[in-house]
């Protein structure tokens, strides 16, 4: 979000212990950027990568961050006089930056990467396959997928929590991203994909990257009808561009094999640095 921050509305707040420990009021002029009626919850994403679910309530005509806010404040160790900027992506997620009293940006409440051995990584993947009701077993397609994905993880790769979990909610905005999409009308680079056996990573086609001179950082933001999720970049020996956490998008959008298509729209800044992937789900009746 920060790479394209001028496109997003924002506000700043000074943290005062006596008034902001239990709840935080959103400035009244900023309410024009929020949905009416207000969503019941929003997501706060810190610079450390984690996501917090926080209740949003209207009290005496003003919007307040309530349940969940004290935990955010505690885990960020907010001190009296420090201030924060809140950048809103329009999809119920705020990116929050914390500055100390001298104006230096602080990175706090960082998510920790967990290094796993190759055997541990395999067992995690198998456990996740057992727990999902989206992907159907298909040995033939597994073999085809392995041929397409012949790269292997580096031996010293750290497998981290690639997507920061989000609480399940009713997808009130899902219709915006589903239905008949005019692909030709998209002005940003884009590509189609379908539900595959290897759902844990989203591979960006090499020709799309090359033809559009795109650059990618260490993480990407997925945007769908429920909000945003952050996926970390995978490490491959052949330098292919892929991002983890795609399985969460597949599951929460209930994608079906041989039936649904996803058009992935790559949002980038003026320097061709891709910061977000907007997910358009195209349903096809069985």
From Swiss-Prot:
InterPro entries: B3_DNA-bd, DNA-bd_pseudobarrel_sf, Plant_B3_domain
Key words of the record: DNA-binding, Nucleus, Transcription, Transcription regulation
UniProt keyword Iron-sulfur, yes or no: no
DNA-binding region(s), chain positions: 9-102
Region called Disordered, residue ranges: 117-161
SUPFAM superfamilies in the record: DNA-binding pseudobarrel domain
Annotated Gene Ontology cellular component terms: nucleus
The UniProt record lists the keyword Metal-binding: no
Gene Ontology biological process terms in this record: regulation of photoperiodism, flowering
UniProt-listed Pfam families: B3 (PF02362)
Chief site of localization: nucleus
Compartments where located: Nucleus
Biased composition (Acidic residues): 119-159
PROSITE patterns associated with the record: B3 (PS50863)
GO molecular function: sequence-specific DNA binding
PANTHER family from the UniProt entry: B3 DOMAIN-CONTAINING (PTHR31920), B3 DOMAIN-CONTAINING PROTEIN REM20 (PTHR31920:SF61)
Protein known as: B3 domain-containing protein REM20
Lineage, uppermost ranks: Eukaryota, Viridiplantae, Streptophyta, Embryophyta, Tracheophyta
Gene that this polypeptide is encoded by: REM20
């Amino acid at each position: 979000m920060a790479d394209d921050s001028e496109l997003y509305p924002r506000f700043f707040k000074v943290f005062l212990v006596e008034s902001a420990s239990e709840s935080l009021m959103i400035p009244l002029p900023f309410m024009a950027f929020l949905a009416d009626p207000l969503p019941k919850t929003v997501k706060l994403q810190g610079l450390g990568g984690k996501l917090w679910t926080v209740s949003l309530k209207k009290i005496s005509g003003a919007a307040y961050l309530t349940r969940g806010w004290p935990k955010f404040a505690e885990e960020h160790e907010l001190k009296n006089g420090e201030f924060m900027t809140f950048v809103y992506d329009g999809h119920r997620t705020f990116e929050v930056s914390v500055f100390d009293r001298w104006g230096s940006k602080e990175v706090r409440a960082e998510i920790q990467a967990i290094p796993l051995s190759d055997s541990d990584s395999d067992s995690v993947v198998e456990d996740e396959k057992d727990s999902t009701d989206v992907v159907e077993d298909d040995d033939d397609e597994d073999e085809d997928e392995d041929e397409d994905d012949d790269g292997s993880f580096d031996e010293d790769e750290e497998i981290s929590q690639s997507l920061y979990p989000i609480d399940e909610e009713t997808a009130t905005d899902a219709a915006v991203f589903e239905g008949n999409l005019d692909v030709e009308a998209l002005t940003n680079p884009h590509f189609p994909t379908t539900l595959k056996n290897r759902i844990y990573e989203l591979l960006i086609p090499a020709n799309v990257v090359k033809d559009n001179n795109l650059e990618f950082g260490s993480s990407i933001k997925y945007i769908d009808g429920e909000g945003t999720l952050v996926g970390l970049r995978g490490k491959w020996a052949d330098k292919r561009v892929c991002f983890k956490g795609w399985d969460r998008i597949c599951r929460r959008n209930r994608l079906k094999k041989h039936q649904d298509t996803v058009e992935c729209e790559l949002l980038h800044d003026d320097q061709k640095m891709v910061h977000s992937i907007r997910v358009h789900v195209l349903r096809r009746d069985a």
